């Protein structure tokens, strides 16, 4: 069984994209999709250990919403 989870993190001034990505990669997640040249509103992960950026509102995306602070504690 994998330690990876279906989670989502909102991207904003308090939770910048580069910090969220740094923490996800520290936890072993790998990029799956694009992150550059777009207006990223959230980052989502899956139980396969992959993450990608999304421009949809976090309420639309499946997964548990966590904060950057919670991500750093994982």
Place the predicted regions along the sequence by residue.
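Structural boundary micro-motifs
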Residues: 1-74
